[in-house]
Amino acid sequence: MKQTVYTASPESQQIHVWSLNHEGTLTLVQVVDVPGQVQTMVVSPDKRYLYVGVRPEFRVLAYRIAPDDGALTFAAESALPGSPTHISTDHHGRFVFVGSYNAGNVSVTRLQDGLPVELVGVVEGLDGCHSANITPDNRTLWVPALKQDRICLFTLSDDGHLVAQEPAEVNTVEGAGPRHMVFHPNRQYAYCVNELNSSVDVWQLKNPHGEIECVQTLDMMPADFSDTRWAADIHITPDGRHLYACDRTASLITVFSVSEDGSVLSVEGFQPTEAQPRGFNIDNSGKYLIAAGQKSHHIAVYEITGTQGLLTEKGRYAVGQGPMWVVVNAY
């Protein structure tokens, strides 16, 4: 298995393309100059394209991924109705979802042969929209509205339109600020990191009709932490055993173990990391975690070790200015 790591640096308008070997070492393959401040990225389900959100001219860009080394070639672009904060796709590679914090909306763009071709629809009124997350069954889109302390639930129609479910939303505790999410591999649980109080909520998917319930809320900060809380990103290992979330003020990654059924998280430790970690990701083997320091202008590679999933630093690498997003592709 070959793996490529992509890092987005908006201040220098660059994507760095890295090869990740089995020992956790990165080798630079390419530096791509992007026509705009690159914000958020996602790899297509068939692993052939990288979709990138840019500003100040709000667009989604599509880059072809070379099958031999992961290098990028520009392929297409499509306009967006707001500054892209988070980008994702459905599991069949038919649609791109873009959440916009500043515009307070989520948009759907149709893909044809892997390329963005037209805007299907926009849902407004999502104050502080920070991500769009399709459920494993490809039926429901979860959209956290950070400023409203709610997660909105939409059914994805066959033609890409979003229809509010019943109930249409679930609420977090006041002042939590739901931000990013991941789903457990068993499809029964989801985990949401809350930006404003640096907590993680565990949501149980109770039935196929979209009914969900919060079954646990866990503080992700050390007991003696007294500064402003500012959580950012969250990811789970492919085997569902370990979960990680980062806080930008503390510049740390919190390590969680996950119960066998996915219902319970336990804090295992705290890993100091690059300054102001805005984004990170986990490789497809579940062996390495790559974190980006928005203020250090570096990325760091950690090995995930032991039964607790603690992190051991393997190396750090200079990237562009203000790196904020990391994605990993395996092929």
Swiss-Prot record:
Belongs to the cycloisomerase 2 family. This is 6-phosphogluconolactonase. It comes from Salmonella gallinarum (strain 287/91 / NCTC 13346). InterPro entries: 6-phosphogluconolactonase_YbhE, Cycloisomerase_2, Lactonase_7-beta_prop, N2O_reductase_N, WD40/YVTN_repeat-like_dom_sf. One of its GO terms (cellular component) is cytosol. Catalyzes the hydrolysis of 6-phosphogluconolactone to 6-phosphogluconate. Pathway: Carbohydrate degradation; pentose phosphate pathway; D-ribulose 5-phosphate from D-glucose 6-phosphate (oxidative stage): step 2/3. Its EC number is 3.1.1.31. GO terms for molecular function: 6-phosphogluconolactonase activity. The keyword S-adenosyl-L-methionine does not apply.
